[in-house]
Every structure is written in C-alpha cells, then in structure tokens.
A protein has these predicted regions:
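Acetyl-CoA-dependent GNAT
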Residues: 1-47, 55-60, 64, 115-116
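Short loop/turn motifs at secondary-structure junctions
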Residues: 38, 69-71
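Conserved G/P- and acidic residue-centered "switch" motifs that form tight phosphate/ATP-binding loops
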Residues: 52
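Conserved short alpha-helix immediately C-terminal to the canonical SAM/SAH-binding motif I
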Residues: 57, 81-84
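C-terminal "cap" of GNAT-fold acetyltransferases
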Residues: 71-74, 78-82, 90-91, 97-117
Length: 117
C-alpha cells in the first residue's frame, strides 16, 4: 500500500534538520466516492507529539490533496484514539458517521469530514 502511495506521490514525510523522520501522512486525492481527498494515515512518532507536527501534516494534506473542485476532506479515526479525534475536531472536522467493526471486530471507526473554505 505505501509503495504504491510513494509512486503516486501521496506520501509526505516530516523530517527534522538531521533528516530524521518525525512523522508522515498518506492520502488519496480522489479517495472518497472517486471525488474527495481521503487521509489514510497520519502518524507522528511518540517522542515528537505535542509539537504541532500533526497539525503541520494535516495542513499539508488539506493544501495539497485537493483539486479546485474538491469541496470536502475525509478521514477515519478509530474509537481507541480519542486524542486524534480531538485534533481533527479542533481542525474543523465533524463526525458524519460511525462504522462499527470496520477494520476489526469490536473496534468502531468514525468517518469525519471537513468542508473546504
């Protein structure tokens, strides 16, 4: 999955001044209904959390994943990750659906959306 994403240039890596990976995102420009940007993964190494790196990665996603006709952004977040859900809400994303047992039995996933502009 990530190899394909790298070839498609849909992976963005946050590096420090020593070229050390701090985190990354993987997204699809037409991932939802073949029309809307979808964020597959945003990950920040634990020791680099709370420094704004996640916010910077999200900004990159929103600035680069959409085309001029895209009006919405989408992502999913698992119920066991309330910190990420809170970050997305603070960035303007709203929960538009719940997907029970989506990735794994007993784990709910929230579909979140943000309107552009």
């Amino acid at each position: 999955m990530l190899t394909h994403a790298v070839v498609q240039k849909n992976v963005y890596v946050a590096l420090n001044e020593n070229e050390k990976c701090l985190g990354f995102i993987y997204y699809m420009t037409n991932g939802v209904f073949g029309s809307y940007p979808y964020l597959h993964i945003v990950a920040v190494k634990e020791e680099y959390r709370n420094y704004g790196i996640g916010r910077q990665l999200m900004k990159y996603f929103e600035d680069n994943a959409s085309n001029s006709s895209s009006t919405k952004y989408f992502l999913t977040v698992d119920d066991f990750n309330p910190r990420a859900k809170k970050l997305y809400e603070n960035l303007g994303y709203q929960c538009v659906g719940e997907l029970p047992d989506f990735y794994k039995e007993g784990i709910n996933c929230y579909l979140m959306m943000k309107r552009r502009g």
